[in-house]
Each structure stands twice: as structure tokens, then as C-alpha cells.
Swiss-Prot record:
Its EC number is 2.7.7.7. Keywords: Cytoplasm, DNA damage, DNA repair, DNA replication, DNA-directed DNA polymerase, Nucleotidyltransferase, Transferase. DNA polymerase involved in damage-induced mutagenesis and translesion synthesis (TLS). It is not the major replicative DNA polymerase. Belongs to the DNA polymerase type-C family. DnaE2 subfamily. It is found in: Cytoplasm. NCBIfam families: polc. It comes from Symbiobacterium thermophilum (strain DSM 24528 / JCM 14929 / IAM 14863 / T). This is Error-prone DNA polymerase.
Length: 1085
């Protein structure tokens, strides 16, 4: 006799399941169990993987969930098929919303009034209907019936059992457990008696939370994390023993020998169930064409209409390409998908929302003619099969970047068009990585939070929870940190056990899922923190379910571009010419800070060596500075051949037209496809399969099989076998490093145009870029330093001149020096006559409401004083924002003593409160002419008046400076390094600007603030650290090789990062200047 576990939790129970899903399935298969259920708490996130892996193991998957009901009771539910699964989704959704979902087209699902979205609770009324296809088990000790029995309320338990039996006629079982808990045997016998009295069947489960008894500690620890308790503290939800494991059938049979029918019923229930998911479904929404025509016909009409607008004259070459693509699209049945994406982009463009398609979709001429992408695939000779092919028959994936500020408008349009019951955000699973595991598990284990914080901050952010020992051995900042690793040994071991376990569900930044059928038939829905409706599957699983995923991504660069273009006024961004010599000249000296995709130190170094003078150079730049090409040693051959220092050769004449534009180097994935097509006669779809085998590092058998096929086909095409073998080895070496050319071209377009804005409109562009933070590679002060270097001033926040965001003003050095008594930073470029004014919201603590209230009041004229502002805003600006503005210097033109102004804030707000209480007639209260208001008012008035302000000494210059920097992230009036420059100059330290004039090999000393240290992968596998030092003249890049890094790594990767001083030799490569570091130390300040 066998047995089936019907109550099983995986890590998708979010901190209440301690064994990986694959391990649970393997354990069930090991013991010959015919089926296995998955019943995670209030979700089915593991359903797709569970069904796939169980079927692969020869086990029947039973999908269910443990539902939390109102009152906190638990109920185990199992779906017998797709209909039951849909009803299960409805009930889980009701639990997350606190009420039954009642979505109507154009309306969102809503939380019940007063319901906490983090505390699922399904109303009992939701169980009273539409439960077909669901089997219900009475649950664990937290089920309503067992809970009532344990409290001696037997009559109420019987009434509850009658209710459930009525809600699930012929499908309700009383659930027995044996977890060796007090009162358990009595409970089981009471349940048996109740079953006999009401004619209800029994079933046994093990309430599984971990695979083996040895994993109990992990389960207990995760429970402590979930309940915010320490392992030395009791909590009613903590397990008392290790009995919630996946017991072998013989153990279950032995333990329940008193209840043989209950054991048999596990098999009977399994026989009633079948897989609930159709993983071959096509749930794409049908696009309703405006003229009622077939979607394929309408798509063809739109494509040719767009082609006429793109090309003017549609040549035979264009027509053949479009027909080829349309044939593949329609044969695969994706015409509705293309129309859906076209419609979304059309909506955005009609409303002036900047957007652009990217990724392999730019390989499509159809996408270009639909204005989804701006890359001409025909002109560039891009292969559609890199995007879609009949052989691969995979769903197309079109990523679209939108202005970050307005992306939600586009998403709202999708909800309106397809209905709230057909659209939801894709979820993400926030998983345990090293830092989160250290913090969460360590706190539960009783470590001091300061110790955990110290440890977590020193672990690289990208390290997995099972890589802590690896990074400790590899990185000196961990080895030399003084961390007593023996103290954390058990914590590190626990972290390894929970690596990549999901902690909670999050919201995908841009993914929307759209379904032809109501989504509740496919997935439960729940509410995210910001009000979005989120499905319970991530981007991988929604595609497995046959749903359309629409990637509406937010790109802050577009926000900056849009602001800059509006500030400039007389520029057509779309028509910026690709041949501007001044832009290429700027890039050619490595001055690309602020340029999309080209601003990292590696890119700046590449630009200075590449000396780009054409758009194709930008496309190559985007593709080549990636971990793969760098590890594959593609950069040096490409540069040498680009500048004629190395001969360009081809293994076969057929390779020349393919590789000519990249100087014989396989740089793009599309080139691999073209080579296989030209040399071996592969169809484009077959060639893409070859690329995918190579790119994704498939197993040796796959590689050998595709290699044999390549050689056979090449020989049949007349290629010498030895040459064919060499070509295959050649592309095999490069294919895994290649980048998608279409994606590179799409990004290169934005890269070039933003470079044009940096070169010709630095004030407007950097102001917009600073307003759009956080984004890009550098902190905001680095952007400000670069703007100043380009002759653009930086003006402090001013209560009468600042707008909400950063803005551009006319400016002169003379006016600055006259007011501030110091000269601004010395620019390398001629002064532009313009300056960037810091916006109100750039000050930490000043949110949109406060800034809006200030600007609305200022419409009536400039503020005369702090008191005037408080009176005219009616006290709408709270104390926190006002004090932040004072400390940031926003009132300096009105109040020279910041400390005195700070004193007045609270008293002025109190006086304004009194004024409002006494009525609008007391308008003069803050001006001191409202007699007879009482002692409290008089006291407030006196304190708020200039006469009532005590004689307080103002902050010192250093204090003012540090507060400005703390609140804005900007060094406004001077740079920190200017405070120590005189001393450093005496000691022989150079500025970044001076280093750029020194000869290669010269030994120099530099100092500055460290910016963006990073350790990219290298071909050798050794660690090389790149970072920049920022001073008042700009950035100087440092290269730190492994031997030096091993000595000084503890100074680099710290939080916060202190100023550093470095000794090293000047390195000149092309036009790029950097320093190879010999010694590093903390800068004495």
C-alpha cells in the first residue's frame, strides 16, 4: 500500500517552507509515491515548476493551497482540474483583497476597507459559491474545526463542519495529523467521532514544511524571520519539533494504523485530481481591428502604410523583406501581439510620451515600419531570425522604453483597453542573497544588528547567500575587515541553506501580463504596495502559461532628454544628425560623462582609444564593453584592426561581407547566424538554433551535434573540411560573447543623441539629468563637477529663485564672486553664460507637496522673509522641509544667520497655527500687530519675531558646507578638495586636470573622493579594480591590479567611502589618461 502527501509547503510559502521544490519531488519519487500535492500559503507561485518537474519525475502533480480565512483559520484546498484551479485562484485573490474580486472593465481590483494586504484573509462568504473542482481538507491545528475542538467548543466545531460539508459537497475531508504534539491523539479521535456523526471521510497528512528531519533548523529559523523573533524567544507559530517532514509511506501507514481508511483516502483523492495547467495554451488577447478586418490583414495594411512613411518608395527589396517577416509572424499566429504593441506605442507617441523599442525586436523591419523601433533592419542588414523564426517558434519579446515619468499613463491605457480582469503586473520573487540572508537570519539568531550591518555592508551586493565563504576568501576588504568569522560560522552555514529562497513577492519594473481569458482562470491576483494588481507568476512562468508579457520599461534617460529638449526649445531631437564632428571629437577624448551607455570608465577609455567618427563606431562601442567581449579578448583585436595596426583577414571569402563592418571580429550575434547561413547553408532559423546552442553554453553533446551538422552542410556547400572546422571553432569561440546588433543599434541611437546634447547644450542637458536622478553611473555631484568643467555654473537652492526641479539661468562669474566672495570652479571649456539652479526637491526631506505649496504661494510675489513664507503658505509646509531648506541655504538671501532662522521655524509655525485658529481676520499675527490674542499667542509672536530670536552664533563655514552636501548631495560653493588643496599642492599632489597633462609612465600623486569602484570580470580571472577619484577639476581614473588590491582593498569597498590618496604611474592609451596605482592610503583631512 502506498500513500500520497496532500499538504506540502515549499519555499513559495514565503519563509514557511524549508526545502526546495525539486528536492521535495525527488524525495517523493525516491519513496515511490504516485502523486504529490503542493499547498503553499495563499499562493500558487510554484505551480508551473511543480507541474513540470513532477511530471518529469513520473509523479502526478496535485495543485492546491493552504488558504487563510477570516478569523485567521487555515483551510487546505486541492484542485481536481482546471475548473477547480480557477476557483482556487478566485479564493486566493479574495484572501489577498479581503473581499471577493469584482473587476469590471476599466476598474481595478480593490482592497476591502481596512484590510491589510499583507495579512490575507478570505471572507467565509466567498466559500459559499463556485467551489466546483475543489477538494477541501479541514486543515492543520489552525483550521477552524481543529481549533474549536482543541478549545473544547465541540458544538461550534460540528456546526463549522456542517458548513464546510455544504460548501464542498462530497469533497470535504477531516484532516488528521501526527506531529507528536500534545493533545494530538485526542484531537484525531475527536475528528474521527465527528466524521462518523456527520458521515464525513477522514484523510491523513503530514503538514510538510521540510524534506527531512535534518532541515528542521532551517524551517525554525525561517519562522523566526517571519515572526520577527529570535531563536531564544518563544512564539506560537514556531514548530515544537522536527515532525513536519516528508515522511516515507511506511512511516505514515504505521503511525495511522488506527485510521487505515484515512490513509487510503490519500490515494482516492489523488485519483480524483489531474494536472491543472495547460502549458501549451495560447492566451494572447485578440486585437479588435477598427474596420473589423482580420488582424493579419490589418497588420499588413499598417506595415505597408508605415513603410511608405519610412522609405517613401517601397522597393522590391523592401517588399520581399516585409513579406518574409509577415509570413513568419502570421504562420506563428503573432499578428495580434504585434498589433497590441503597435497600439501601445501609437498611444504613447500621440500623447508626446517619448519611447523606443529595443532588444532583438530591432531586427524586425515590421517593427520599424510600425514605429515600434527606430532601427532600420533592412538598411543595416539585420536578420529577422535573430528575433523570430519558424524553427524556434518561440514567443516574440518586444521591450519598449518609455519616459519614466509617464510610463504609468501607458500602463493605464492598457488596463482601460483590455479590462482590469485581463491585465496585471508581472511579479518578481525577492530572493535571499548574501546581504539579506546575513541580516534576516543573523537577527533571528540573536546577533547584534551593528555586527550584522558591519558584515553585510562589506559583502558584495551581487554575492549569493551560498557564496559568502567564497567572497571572504577572494576579497581583501572582507579578509582584512577584522570580522571574527568563527563567530558567524553557523550563520554562514544557514545562509547557504536558504540561498535563492523567495522572501516575498515584488512587482516587475515594467512587465504587464495580458490574457485573452479572465486572469483569474490562470493566476491569483494580489495588491502591491503602490496599488498595482500583481499576478503570482514571474516573467518566466507567465510565458510558460501562454500569456502575453508586455515590457513597458521606464527609462529615466528619456525623462532627461524630454526636459532638456523643452528647455532648449529650438531643437528637433529626432532629427539630430548622426554626423556631427564636434560630438565625435568630444567622445574621442573620452569626455562622455552623462552620455547614455558611454559614461562608465571602461567606455570613456574605449572612446578615447577608438576615436569614433561614425555612427557604426557607437554601435560597436555599446556591444563591445560587456563582460563577454572583454573576457573573450575581443576589444584589442577590434581596436587594432579599426586603426589599421593589425591586418584584417578572413578565413573564407564568404566571411568578408559579413565581418567587414567589424574588421573581421565576430562582434554581433547576428553575424553568427549569417556565417552559418553563408558557409554551411543553414536556414536562418537553423542558424539561430546554432547560435543559441553556442551562446547558452549547452552541454557537450549538443555542441558536438551542432558541430557535426555544420561541417556536413559546409562540405556539401563546397567548403574545404579543414576550413569549415576552423570556421566552426572560430565562431564557437566568439558566439557566447557576441551581442545583439539590433539592441546595440537601438541603444547607440540614444547614446549618440545624448552625446550631442552634452556637447552643444550642456547646461540644459545636465540640469535635466540631475533632475532625473537617481539614474546613470555617477552620483549627482560628479555630474555637477562635469557641468562646471564645461563652463556651466551651479547655483545654490534659493527660496525665491528655485523651481521644483533643476533649472537653467543666465549667469556670470562676476555676479557669483560679488555675492559669494569666492570664485567658482575653473572650467576647462569656455563659460557658457548659463548656470544650473538647484531645485527645491533636490533638498532631502522636501517632497512634492511642500515644493508645490511654496511655488503656489510664490506666484503672488517673492517672499520677504521666512515669516512671510509661513504666512502665505498657511503653514502647509511642515517643520521638517522648512528646516531642511534653511540648512541647505535656501533662505540665505533673506536671513544671513542660518542657525537663527532655524530657531524661528517652529515658533513661526506655531504662530501660524494660532492665527488660523483665531480666524482669517488675524492676518497680521506674524507681523506682530494682532493684540489681545492671549498669553500663548503673545509668546509665539515674541519667539517668532526677530527681536525674540536669541543672539545665536551662526554655523561655521565647514558646518554650513557639510549640511549643504548632506541635504543635496552637491558641493555648491566649493568642492571638498579645495579645503585641502593648498596642503596637497605643497606635498606634490596633482589635480585631475594636471594629471591629464603629464607624460606616460610618470610617477604622480593624486587625491580625491572615490567614485564607483567596481571589479568587472577579466579574461585571466584575476581581480582588477577600476575606480575614479573626483576633485574640483573632474575625474581621474585609477586601475588597481590584484597584487595592489590585495593590500588596499579594505580602503576601497567600504561604506561610507572616505577620501583617498594614491601614488601611481600615468597610463596613456589613445587619448585616455589613467593612473595605475602602486600605493593607496586614506587622505588626512
Amino acid at each position: 500500500m502506498s500513500f500520497v502527501h496532500l499538504h506540502v509547503h515549499s519555499p513559495f510559502s514565503f519563509l514557511d517552507g524549508a526545502s526546495r521544490l525539486d528536492d521535495l519531488i525527488a524525495e517523493a519519487a525516491l519513496h515511490g509515491m504516485p502523486a504529490l500535492a503542493l499547498t503553499d500559503h495563499n499562493n500558487v507561485s510554484g505551480a508551473v515548476r511543480f507541474q513540470r518537474k513532477a511530471q518529469e519525475a513520473g509523479i502526478q502533480p496535485i495543485q492546491g493551497a493552504e488558504l487563510t480565512l477570516e478569523g485567521g483559520y487555515h483551510l487546505t484546498l486541492l484542485a481536481t482540474g482546471p475548473k477547480g484551479y480557477a476557483n482556487l485562484n478566485r479564493l486566493i485573490t479574495a484572501a489577498h483583497l479581503g473581499q471577493e474580486p469584482r473587476a469590471t472593465p476599466g476598474a481595478m481590483f480593490a482592497l476591502a476597507p481596512g484590510h491589510d494586504r499583507l495579512q490575507p484573509a478570505c471572507p467565509l462568504s466567498a466559500l459559499s459559491h463556485d467551489t466546483d473542482g475543489l477538494i477541501a481538507l479541514s486543515g492543520c491545528r489552525r483550521g477552524e474545526i481543529p481549533s474549536l475542538i482543541l478549545r473544547g467548543r465541540l458544538a461550534e466545531a460540528e456546526a463549522a463542519a456542517r458548513r464546510y460539508a455544504a460548501w464542498f459537497p462530497g469533497r470535504f475531508y477531516l484532516e488528521l495529523h501526527d506531529e507528536r504534539l500534545p493533545g494530538e491523539q485526542a484531537l484525531n479521535r475527536a475528528l474521527r467521532d465527528l466524521g462518523e456523526a456527520l458521515g464525513l471521510p477522514l484523510v491523513v497528512t503530514s503538514n510538510v514544511h521540510h524534506r527531512t528531519r535534518e532541515e528542521f533548523f532551517v524551517h525554525d529559523l525561517l519562522t523566526c524571520v517571519r515572526t520577527l523573533t529570535r531563536i531564544d524567544q518563544p512564539h506560537p507559530e514556531r514548530p515544537l519539533n522536527d515532525q513536519r517532514y516528508l515522511k516515507p509511506p511506511e512511516v505514515m501507514i504505521e503511525r495511522f494504523r488506527e485510521f487505515p481508511e484515512a490513509v487510503k483516502n490519500t490515494l482516492a483523492i489523488a485519483e480524483r485530481c489531474r494536472p491543472v495547467l495547460d502549458l501549451d495554451a495560447r492566451l494572447h488577447p485578440e486585437f479588435q481591428t477598427p474596420d473589423g478586418s482580420h488582424p493579419a490583414a490589418y497588420l499588413t495594411h499598417l506595415v505597408y502604410d508605415g513603410a511608405a512613411r519610412r522609405y517613401g518608395r517601397i522597393t522590391e527589396r523592401i517588399r520581399r523583406r516585409l513579406e518574409h517577416e509577415l509570413t513568419i509572424i502570421t504562420r506563428l499566429g503573432y499578428e495580434d501581439y504585434f498589433l497590441l504593441v503597435w497600439d501601445v506605442v501609437r498611444f504613447a507617441r500621440e500623447r508626446g510620451i517619448r519611447c523606443a523599442g529595443r532588444g532583438s525586436a530591432a531586427d524586425s523591419a515590421v517593427a520599424y515600419c510600425l514605429f515600434i523601433t527606430d532601427v532600420d533592419a533592412i538598411e543595416r542588414g539585420l536578420l529577422f531570425e535573430r528575433f523570430m523564426s519558424l524553427e524556434r517558434a518561440q514567443k516574440p519579446d518586444i521591450d519598449i522604453d518609455f519616459d519614466a515619468r509617464r510610463r504609468d499613463e501607458v500602463a493605464a491605457y492598457v488596463y482601460r483597453k483590455y479590462g482590469a480582469d485581463h491585465v496585471a503586473s508581472v511579479c518578481t520573487y525577492n530572493t535571499f542573497q548574501a546581504r539579506s540572508a546575513v541580516r534576516d537570519l543573523g537577527k533571528a539568531m540573536g546577533f547584534q544588528e551593528a555586527d550584522l550591518d558591519y558584515l553585510a555592508k562589506r559583502i558584495p551586493w551581487h554575492a549569493g547567500a551560498d557564496e559568502i565563504l567564497t567572497v571572504m576568501a577572494r576579497y581583501p576588504e572582507l579578509r582584512q575587515s577584522g570580522i571574527p568569522w568563527h563567530k558567524f560560522e553557523q550563520l554562514v552555514q544557514a545562509a547557504e541553506r536558504v540561498a535563492r529562497f523567495p522572501r516575498f513577492i515584488g512587482t516587475h519594473l515594467g512587465g504587464l501580463v495580458i490574457s485573452r481569458r479572465p486572469l483569474l482562470e490562470v493566476t491569483p491576483l494580489q495588491m502591491a504596495a503602490k496599488g498595482q494588481v500583481v499576478c503570482q507568476f514571474d516573467k518566466e512562468y507567465v510565458e510558460d502559461l501562454g500569456l502575453v508579457k508586455l515590457d513597458l520599461l521606464s527609462l529615466r534617460t528619456f525623462t532627461a532628454v524630454d526636459d532638456a529638449v523643452r528647455a532648449i526649445g529650438d531643437i528637433d531631437y529626432e532629427q539630430i544628425p548622426h554626423g556631427d564632428a564636434a560630438t565625435y571629437e568630444m567622445l574621442g577624448v573620452g569626455e562622455s560623462i552623462g552620455v547614455f551607455q558611454l559614461e562608465s570608465p571602461a567606455q570613456r577609455a574605449l572612446q578615447a582609444r577608438l576615436k569614433p567618427d561614425r555612427f557604426e563606431d557607437i554601435v560597436a562601442s555599446v556591444a563591445i564593453i560587456r563582460p563577454g567581449p572583454i573576457k573573450g579578448n575581443m576589444v584589442e583585436p577590434f581596436l587594432a584592426r579599426r586603426h589599421g595596426k593589425e591586418e584584417v583577414t578572413y578565413l573564407h571569402p564568404k566571411l568578408k561581407p559579413i565581418l567587414e563592418k567589424t574588421y573581421g571580429v565576430v562582434l554581433f550575434q547576428e553575424q553568427v547566424i549569417e556565417i552559418a547561413t553563408a558557409v554551411a547553408g543553414f536556414t536562418p532559423g537553423e542558424a539561430d538554433q546554432l547560435r543559441r546552442v553556442m551562446t547558452h553554453a549547452r552541454n557537450r553533446e549538443d555542441m558536438e551535434a551542432i558541430g557535426r551538422l555544420f561541417r556536413q552542410k559546409a562540405a556539401a556547400a563546397g567548403v574545404d573540411p579543414a576550413v569549415a572546422d576552423t570556421i566552426f571553432s572560430y565562431i564557437q569561440g566568439y558566439a557566447s560573447y557576441g551581442f545583439c546588433e539590433a539592441h546595440a543599434a537601438a541603444f547607440a541611437n540614444t547614446a549618440y543623441k545624448t552625446a550631442y546634447l552634452v556637447r552643444h547644450y550642456p547646461a540644459e542637458y545636465f540640469a535635466a539629468l540631475m533632475s532625473a536622478q537617481p539614474m546613470g553611473y555617477y552620483p549627482i555631484n560628479t555630474l555637477a563637477v562635469e557641468a562646471r568643467r564645461r563652463g556651466v555654473g551651479l547655483l545654490p537652492v534659493d527660496i525665491n529663485r528655485s523651481e521644483e526641479a533643476f533649472t537653467v539661468e543666465e549667469w556670470s562669474r562676476e555676479a557669483w564672486e560679488a555675492f559669494w566672495g569666492m570664485e567658482p570652479f575653473a572650467p576647462e571649456y569656455p563659460a557658457t553664460g548659463k548656470a544650473i539652479r538647484i531645485g527645491l526637491r533636490a533638498v532631502k526631506g522636501v517632497g512634492e507637496p511642500a515644493a508645490a505649496a511654496i511655488l503656489a504661494a510664490r506666484d503672488g510675489g517673492e517672499f520677504r522673509s521666512l515669516a512671510d513664507l509661513v504666512r502665505r503658505t498657511g503653514g502647509a509646509v511642515p517643520r521638517g522641509p522648512l528646516e531642511a531648506l534653511v540648512l541647505a541655504g535656501a533662505f540665505d538671501r533673506l536671513h544671513s544667520n542660518r542657525r537663527a532662522a532655524l530657531w524661528q521655524v517652529a515658533h513661526l509655525l506655531e504662530a501660524e497655527r494660532i492665527r488660523q485658529e483665531r480666524g482669517a481676520g488675524q492676518a497680521g499675527l506674524l507681523d506682530g500687530d494682532a493684540p489681545g490674542l492671549g498669553a500663548q499667542a503673545a509668546e509665539a509672536l515674541e519667539a517668532a519675531s526677530p527681536q525674540g530670536t536669541p543672539a545665536i552664533a551662526d554655523f561655521g563655514a565647514a558646518e554650513r558646507y557639510l549640511k549643504e552636501y548632506e541635504l543635496t548631495g552637491l558641493m555648491v560653493r566649493t568642492h571638498f578638495m579645495r579645503f585641502v588643496r593648498e596642503r596637497l599642492a605643497r606635498e606634490g599632489y596633482l589635480t585631475a586636470q594636471e594629471v591629464r597633462q603629464r607624460r606616460a609612465g610618470e610617477l604622480v600623486k593624486v587625491a580625491g573622493l572615490p567614485v564607483c569602484p567596481h571589479r568587472p570580470p577579466t579574461r585571466s580571472g584575476k581581480i582588477v579594480v577600476f575606480l575614479s577619484l573626483e576633485d574640483e577639476t573632474g575625474l581621474i581614473d585609477l586601475t588597481i591590479f590584484e597584487d595592489v588590491y590585495q593590500r588596499y582593498g579594505h580602503l576601497i569597498f567600504t561604506d561610507p567611502r572616505p577620501p583617498l590618496a594614491a601614488l601611481g604611474r600615468v597610463d596613456r592609451r589613445g587619448g585616455h589618461v589613467s593612473i595605475t596605482v602602486n600605493r593607496l592610503r586614506l587622505l588626512d583631512t
